[in-house]
C-alpha cells in the first residue's frame, strides 16, 4: 500500500500528528536531507582543516555548507508536503532542485515577515513616545500598556504560526504573497487550533529526538572508550598526518567522524518538525478559501502597482 492509499484510508483524520513517523519511512526525504547534511558536514570539516592556510576557505566552504543544508531541508520539505497531500513522489534529484529553487521564495517570505513584525515594534515605540508627554502621559500609559502587551502577544502568536506554515505553503506551490496571505487568514481564523497542533507535534518530535540523540550519544561514548586505549590520546591538527594516516591526527579523523554521525542523526530527526509544518499547513489551508484569498491578494498587488506607476 503506497502513501496515497494510506492517506485515503485515513479520511477521518488525514493530517493527524500521529502521521509523523511516516516522515522517517519516506526514503526520498531521508535521502535528500541526509545527503545535504552529510555534504554540508564534510564541507564544514574541510573548511576547518584548511583554516590554517587561509581564512577564506572556512568562510566560503561554511557558506556553501549552509546553502546546501537549507536547500536540502527545503527539498525534504517539498517531499513531505507531497507525502502529506498523498501525491505521487518525484525523484530525489527533482526534490533537490525544487529545494534549491525554493530558497529565494523562503528568504523573501522571511524578510517580509521580519519587516511586518518590525513595523509592529515601531508602532509600539511610537505609542510609547506619545505616552512620554508630560501631564497626560502617565494617564495614557494606563490604557496603552495593556493594549500594547496584547498587540505584541498577538503579533508573536501570528509570527510563530506563520513561520511554521509559510515554508510548507511555498513547498506546496504557493507564491510568496499568496503563502503569506493564506497564513494570515489561518492565523486570524484558527490561531489556537493551529498553534495547538504545532506545539503537540513539536513535543512528539522532541521526545523522539531525545531518544535518538541519547542512543547516538551513549554509542559514541562506548566507541570512544574503546578507541582511547587502542589509538591513544592526542589531538594534533596536522593535515598531512591526517591524510597520511599516522600520528595523533587519528583523533582528528575520529572527531570528524563523530561530527558526521551527529550531523546525519540531526538530518534524520529534523524531518519530524518539517512533517509537523506540512501537516499543519495541509489541514488548515483546507479550512480557508484559498482561491478567494489568492484573488484578493492579486487584486491588492495590482492596485499597489498601479499607484506606484502613477508616481
Per-region residue spans from a language model:
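Long, hydrophobic alpha/beta structural blocks
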Residues: 170-171
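Short, charged/polar low-complexity linear motifs in solvent-exposed/disordered segments
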Residues: 49, 124-126, 212-214
Amino acid at each position: 500500500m503506497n502513501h496515497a492509499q494510506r492517506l485515503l484510508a485515513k479520511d477521518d483524520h488525514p493530517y493527524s500528528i500521529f502521521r509523523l513517523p511516516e516522515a522517517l519511512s519516506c526514503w526520498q526525504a531521508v535521502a535528500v536531507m541526509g545527503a545535504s547534511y552529510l555534504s554540508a558536514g564534510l564541507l564544514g570539516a574541510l573548511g576547518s582543516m584548511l583554516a590554517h592556510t587561509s581564512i577564506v576557505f572556512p568562510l566560503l566552504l561554511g557558506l556553501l555548507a549552509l546553502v546546501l543544508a537549507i536547500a536540502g531541508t527545503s527539498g525534504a520539505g517539498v517531499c513531505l508536503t507531497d507525502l502529506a497531500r498523498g501525491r505521487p513522489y518525484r525523484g530525489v534529484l527533482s526534490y533537490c532542485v525544487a529545494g534549491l529553487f525554493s530558497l529565494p521564495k523562503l528568504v523573501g517570505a522571511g524578510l517580509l515577515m521580519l519587516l511586518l513584525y518590525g513595523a509592529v515594534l515601531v508602532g509600539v515605540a511610537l505609542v510609547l513616545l506619545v505616552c512620554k508627554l508630560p501631564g497626560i502621559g502617565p494617564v495614557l500609559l494606563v490604557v496603552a500598556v495593556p493594549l500594547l502587551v496584547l498587540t505584541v502577544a498577538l503579533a508573536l502568536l501570528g509570527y510563530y504560526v506563520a513561520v511554521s506554515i509559510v515554508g510548507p505553503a511555498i513547498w506546496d506551490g504557493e507564491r510568496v504573497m499568496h503563502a503569506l496571505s493564506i497564513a494570515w487568514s489561518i492565523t486570524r481564523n484558527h490561531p489556537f487550533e493551529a498553534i495547538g497542533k504545532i506545539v503537540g507535534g513539536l513535543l512528539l518530535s522532541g521526545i523522539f529526538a531525545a531518544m535518538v540523540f541519547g542512543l547516538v550519544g551513549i554509542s559514541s561514548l562506548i566507541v570512544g572508550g574503546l578507541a582511547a586505549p587502542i589509538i591513544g590520546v592526542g589531538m594534533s591538527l596536522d593535515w598531512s598526518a591526517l591524510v597520511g594516516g599516522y600520528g595523533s591526527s587519528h583523533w582528528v579523523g575520529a572527531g570528524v567522524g563523530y561530527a558526521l554521525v551527529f550531523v546525519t542523526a540531526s538530518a534524520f530527526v529534523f524531518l519530524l518538525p518539517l512533517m509537523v509544518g506540512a501537516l499543519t499547513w495541509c489541514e488548515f489551508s483546507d479550512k480557508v478559501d484559498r482561491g478567494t484569498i489568492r484573488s484578493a491578494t492579486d487584486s491588492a498587488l495590482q492596485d499597489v502597482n498601479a499607484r506606484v506607476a502613477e508616481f
